Amino acid sequence: MDAESLLLALELASGSGQGLSPDRRASLLTSLMLVKRDYRFDRVLFWGRILGLVADYYIAQGVSEDQLAPRKTLYSLNCMEWSLLPPATKEMETQTSVVKGRFMGDPSHEYEHTELQKVNEGEKVFEEEVVVQIKEETRLVSVIDQIDKAVAVIPRGALFKTPFGPINVNRTFEGLSLSEAKKLSSYFHFREPVELKNKTLLEKAELDPSLDFMDSLEHDIPKGSWSVQMERGNALVVLRSLLWPGLTFYHAPRTKNYGYIYVGTGEKNLDLPFML
Amino acid sequence: MGDPPPDPEPPSQPTSSSRNSQVSERRRSRERTRPLVPEELQQIPLDPQRNLRGWPQRASLTPNENLVFQAEDPYVNPGFSAEVQPQAYLSEGRLQASHNASLMLPQLQQGEGNLFQQLESAYQGPPADLPGQFTMYQREDLPFSQGTQHGPYMRDDPTLQFSPSELGFMSFNMELPEPEPRELAVQNAKAYLLQTSVNSDLSLYEHLANMLTKILNQRPEDPLFLLESLNRTTQWEWFHPKLDTLRDDPEMQPTYEMAERQKALFGRSGSGEGEQEMEEETAETAVPNIMEKAFYFEQAGVGLSSDESFRVFMALKQLVEQQPIHTCRFWGKILGLSRSYLVAEVEFREGEEEAEEEEVEEMTEGGEGMEAHGEEEGDEDEDKATDVIPKPTWKPPPVIPKEDSRTGTNRYLYFVCNEPGRPWMRLPHVTPIQIVQARKIRKFFTGYLDAPVISYPPFPGNEANYLRAQIARISAATHISPLGFYQFGEEEGDEEEEGGAGRDSYEENPDFEGIPVLELVDSMANWVHHTQHILPQGRCTWVNPLQKTEEEEELGEEEEKADEGVEEVEQEVGPPLLTPLSEDAEIMHMAPWTARLSCTLSPQYSVAVVRSNLWPGAYAYASGKKFENIYIGWGHKYSPENFNPSLPAPIQHEYPSGPDTIEMSDPTVEEEQALKAAQEQALAAAEEEEEDEEEDEDEDQDD
């Protein structure tokens, strides 16, 4: 959610039950302003909160002019001092995929994972148990990246693409209509498109190239991994991800308010197929 | 647009020409029909300034003025013949455009039909007819009373001599002059702009014209800045004409309905008794102070927003008015796929709920009785059949009776509603088997209470039962209070009761002084569970399933045989009531509870917040003498390992093969024939014997 409309956004996203306490809200309002100035971001988004056992991580993301460029992620433990996280890489993802369980809340905490590695000693090949240390910070980076790639949502029409390249915020976006808001096809993944090229020519013919340049949520696997609900007496549409429980996207139809926030434990719901 | 820049002309001219073009058709028709026009037209060039002043009026598009303005343009300057032609083509474009077509159609019909046919044909074949157009528009400069024109034909009209234009030479020149390349370019550009887009009937030309009209109508401060948004709005308005004020917007209908319903929440029941009502209401009510609790939870960063909490409060108030409720509490919110549930935990006043319970029980018992009868009849029929079907030796496991109301898991009644304003629905009591099965499955709630729960092992009930079972589990696991808030009643001195079940009731401690917040956060021993733990059996108090109640003894005579195979069942014991949290089992080396101060910056005013790691979404706060629990979440337990569904039951044994159960195979044709042959032989042999015997007898007789 945009840091500029933080209060309203928190109010609208509160249907999922988790929000921020007043002191955190106040600190965020000030500190995000400073972050925007220091890092020269075009927009700062408050991404959410990952609940740890000892402490929680508050995550913010900074967006540059091109909205789809990789965003810089910052974390903080007290909503005041922010530290930049390194960008996520493939190795990080494979490394952290073995770590399970909750986040501790201490960025320097190290998870120990024993692996069997083949070690060549001269002519002998034997397996040795190697204890690999994985830092929680790496895990944090990787989880945030996965969540962004999987379930960050933006409504159709909020961004538009110019033929010259950069993706811009659409200042004339007036919100989706009520009938559109209930359909999953009106929402896109807020990331580089992956499946767009797989569409048939017939489907592509109906797309508007300036607006439909991202993957829509319609074809997410497993089907039904999004819960679409109307709240506040039909005045707010809320999408909740079932794959990463804790991600809430809200949008007030016919207005410009939209945003998403993740408040959760940072664990993927791998039992989803059983639960639907 | 490719118009040649008109220099001495005021800058509004190009736009004005475009405006003109829109109704040029109309005007031209009027030109045809009004011979008076030429004189007016003649006068206009005397006052080119009028063009500017007349602009706002022009926008209103009254026919007369338009006519005047349009007609004036060709006369502004003879040197602007080039200007004239674009207008001509614009007007052709108008023919194509559906927008004005409807407006112009009657005029077209009134006007000289021939002219427009000619125009159309001219447009369709611009290159061929360019010269024709050229000449026609040259002629347009002339005031003419009679309409019919056919392109490059000469017109034999004495009035043609009037015009100061250079048409003079055209009148005598039958050759078709080459159009200048510039004009050609202009015409091409215009034709391109008039293309209608694929998705709609709107062409860029029309759109630009609309937008410029709008800008000129409204005269905003900084039109360049607003250009983009105006662009979008104009386009949008084209396709979404404003609906009647008499008709409601169909899309917003459900929203308005919901708003009406919520409005009803805010209305006070009973009208205008004024002070009396106020006094009644300020007395003790069963409705808890939701707003206060919401405030504390907000400090912890949990809970619904404040206006939503207020709506919940009003909804609870409505519930209290509708049902005979003794105490009431907002239990929490369970999220579902299509809708969510708001759950209220209530206790009825003494004796009130028995009536409903009995009705429900009678219905179920009646149903069971009928089923039993049906089965018995079926059995009898089968018995009468020739084959005796072996009776199965499998017996269903004994049904563990559910707990009584107000005890154990059924201590409280739960009402749910989807949104404040919707009616509250009561959830049925939970049975032990439902809890046991609920532990084995993991399903999302859809939001509809009568939805079936499709799972393996099959859940005995629908979503209402599953919801109730989860609520029971969550309550038992996560309802905590500060140590000392509740204490055991002094009347129960004995710890040993039936089967060592322990105490199951508690009362508030009037001497509770509150524990300092820091201590609450530091040690989990300062919190206790105040709901009973649910045993693996599914109940809070253990019941030996093999003990027969009186009903069972009446019905099940056959079941006595099963006593022989009885196994000893161990009594299940769970932690007693008011156990501190420090005794809770760890989840994979992880503490089951996390305690924090709500605000580290101001510890003196914070509340202690405890969060459950076992049931994510369960929170409790305590501050001074107040505490509260809430659950907002999906309704599932946290498990570090992945969910493993139960395996299906092993394949049942088949009956051992024996002569009773094996089907006889039919004899094949060969066998039958062989049998037949053997039978015939035997018969033949028998006949021979008989014959022999007869012969013997005969012989005997003969003798």
UniProtKB/Swiss-Prot annotation, chain A:
PANTHER family this protein is in? MITOCHONDRIAL RIBOSOMAL PROTEIN S18, RADIAL SPOKE HEAD PROTEIN 9 HOMOLOG
Provide the leader sequence positions.
Answer: none
Keyword Signal assigned: no
- Localization annotation: Cytoplasm, Cytoskeleton, Cilium axoneme; Cytoplasm, Cytoskeleton, Flagellum axoneme; Cell projection, Kinocilium
The principal location of this protein is cytoplasm
Q: Name one GO biological process term.
A: cilium movement involved in cell motility
| GO CC aspect terms | 9+2 motile cilium; axoneme; kinocilium; radial spoke head; sperm flagellum
Summary of subunit composition and partner proteins: Component of the axonemal radial spoke 1 (RS1) and 2 (RS2) complexes, at least composed of spoke head proteins RSPH1, RSPH3, RSPH9 and the cilia-specific component RSPH4A or sperm-specific component RSPH6A, spoke stalk proteins RSPH14, DNAJB13, DYDC1, ROPN1L and NME5, and the RS1 complex-specific anchor protein IQUB. Interacts with IQUB. Interacts with RSPH3B. Interacts with RSPH4A. Interacts with RSPH6A. Interacts with CFAP61. Interacts with LRRC23.
> Can you say what this protein is called?
Radial spoke head protein 9 homolog
Cite the entry's keywords alphabetically: Cell projection, Cilium, Cilium biogenesis/degradation, Cytoplasm, Cytoskeleton, Flagellum
For this protein, the record's InterPro entries field holds: RSP9 (IPR055316)
Task: Report the sequence similarity comment from the record.
Answer: Belongs to the flagellar radial spoke RSP9 family.
> Which organism is this protein's natural source?
Bos taurus (Bovine)
What is the purpose of this protein?
Answer: Functions as part of axonemal radial spoke complexes that play an important part in the motility of sperm and cilia. Essential for both the radial spoke head assembly and the central pair microtubule stability in ependymal motile cilia. Required for motility of olfactory and neural cilia and for the structural integrity of ciliary axonemes in both 9+0 and 9+2 motile cilia.
